[in-house]
């Protein structure tokens, strides 16, 4: 090849390289722009792990605090990329159905409307390096002044178009009381499988139209999936609203959660079959089977929660390492058109490709591989049908005796008001203790 040919060939390579670079940059830019923010508990980047939000008084409690009190929320997460990536955050007031209230921040904040996360620490003596971030709410920079639902938004480099985390929390102004109880269903066929929630709102405030001004939402184990909305009280009495309609607020009791213990990688604790240590820790769990038998078996669980713990170090937040946790399920699905997922509070009960199980034809089992921080974990298996319906009883069973916690949130919108406020809350166990 002559000099001219070499020169033309080199120019062609440079043009091709330039086009590839342009395509790569454009693709990355489009992907960043295509991130859709949602008003639910969600992680938007795979390097973000172990998101927690709870009332500081009790770890993994419902993320709710009382307005104008000394209570705070603790919110934290890990970034597996390490370093300090300059995360900022803001909060936004929402409706009872978790949609934007569409009011100005000066209506719901008595402070600034955004801040930088300055409290962070680096992991110590771990194979998986990470940075641990934490904030307390409310604080001097972010301080809600009205009750209601709020969404916490974390984003990178002060760019709100690049969301990192969205996290729901609640601010309560307890002007009413809520009494709740768990009873058997009137449905004879399923009364040994279903738990029914009856509740009463006790108030001294004037409520002009309970059908329009009051909404009550009931959840099981602080799981937003399957939340039930109540807009019509069964009985309206002086000073109280009664919600005990037949077949209303009924939940499958489910079963006690499965669990495992990875507080140490030096020995095999509960439900851990093997531990391997290489460039990263690997914990292989014992094989699981279908638990939907005819009889209830009592065992202690944490109602789907998880707790970061570490017996190999001192500080659970920074000394707890990560591991690839291998789940396996030997069970026959209801049909071939659907998928099995591993869910718990550790992944917000959210169905995603990361927690989908894959069938191994050679071993005749379903497997999932999740990267999780050391600790105590509850989990369960659910079936997602082809039409998007969730069945969390097929692999687990359902029993009235199962211990579950139920949350009742009561919202009030003043006549002519522009937003809803959270005025009542109750957290009740299905077991009488």
Outline where the language-model segments fall.
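Bacterial Sec-dependent N-terminal signal peptides
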Residues: 1-35
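Short, compositionally biased P/S/T/A/G/V-rich stretches that sit at domain boundaries
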Residues: 33-66, 173-188, 301-314
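Low-complexity, Pro/Ser/Thr- and charge-rich linker/hinge segments at domain boundaries
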Residues: 36-38, 171-192, 399-423
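Contiguous beta-strand segments within globular domains
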Residues: 44-93, 189-201, 314-327
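Short acidic/polar inter-strand loop motif in beta-rich domains
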Residues: 96-98, 142, 156-162, 223, ...
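Aromatic-rich carbohydrate-binding modules that target alpha-glucans
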Residues: 110-133, 225-233, 326-374, 386-413
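Ligand-binding face of N-terminal immunoglobulin V-set domains in extracellular IgSF glycoproteins
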Residues: 129-142, 147-157
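Basic K/R-rich, polyanion-interacting modules in nucleoproteins and related proteins
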Residues: 284-336, 422-433
């Amino acid at each position: 090849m002559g000099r001219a040919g070499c020169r033309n060939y080199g120019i062609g390579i440079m043009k091709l390289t330039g086009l590839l670079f342009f395509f790569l940059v454009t693709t990355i830019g489009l992907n960043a722009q295509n991130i859709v923010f949602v008003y639910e508990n969600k992680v938007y980047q795979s390097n973000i792990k172990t998101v927690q939000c709870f009332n500081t008084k009790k770890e993994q409690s419902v993320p709710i605090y009382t307005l104008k009190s000394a209570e705070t929320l603790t919110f934290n997460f890990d970034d597996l990329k390490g370093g300090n990536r300059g995360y900022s955050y803001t909060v936004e007031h929402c409706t009872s159905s978790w949609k934007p209230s569409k009011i100005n921040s000066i209506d719901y904040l008595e402070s600034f409307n955004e801040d930088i996360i300055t409290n962070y620490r680096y992991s110590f003596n771990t194979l998986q390096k990470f940075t641990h971030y934490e904030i307390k709410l409310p604080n001097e920079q972010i301080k809600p002044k009205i009750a209601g639902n709020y969404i916490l938004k974390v984003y990178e480099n002060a760019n709100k178009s690049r969301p990192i985390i969205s996290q729901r929390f609640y601010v309560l102004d307890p002007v009413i009381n809520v009494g709740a109880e768990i009873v058997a269903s009137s449905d004879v066929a399923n009364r040994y499988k279903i738990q029914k929630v009856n509740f009463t709102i006790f108030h001294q405030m004037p409520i002009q139209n309970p059908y329009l001004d009051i909404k009550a939402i009931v959840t099981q184990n602080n799981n937003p999936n399957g939340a039930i909305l109540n807009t019509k009280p069964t009985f309206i009495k002086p000073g109280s609203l009664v919600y005990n309609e037949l077949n209303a607020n009924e939940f499958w009791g489910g079963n006690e959660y499965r669990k495992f213990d990875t507080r140490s990688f030096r020995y095999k604790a509960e439900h851990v079959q093997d531990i391997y240590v290489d460039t990263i820790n690997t914990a292989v769990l014992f094989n699981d089977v279908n638990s939907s038998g005819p009889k209830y078996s009592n065992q202690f669980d944490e109602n789907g929660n998880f707790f970061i713990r570490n017996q190999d170090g001192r500080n659970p937040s920074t000394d707890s390492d990560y591991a690839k946790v291998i789940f396996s399920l030997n069970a026959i699905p209801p049909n071939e058109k659907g998928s099995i997922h591993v869910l718990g509070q550790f992944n917000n009960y959210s169905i995603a490709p990361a927690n989908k199980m894959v069938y191994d034809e050679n071993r005749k089992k379903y497997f999932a591989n999740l990267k999780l921080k050391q600790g105590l974990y509850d989990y369960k298996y659910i079936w997602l049908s082809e039409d998007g319906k969730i069945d969390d009883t097929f692999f687990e069973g359902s029993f009235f005796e199962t211990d579950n916690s139920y949350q009742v949130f009561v919202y009030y919108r003043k006549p002519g008001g522009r937003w809803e406020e959270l005025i009542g809350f109750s957290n009740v166990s299905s077991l009488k203790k």
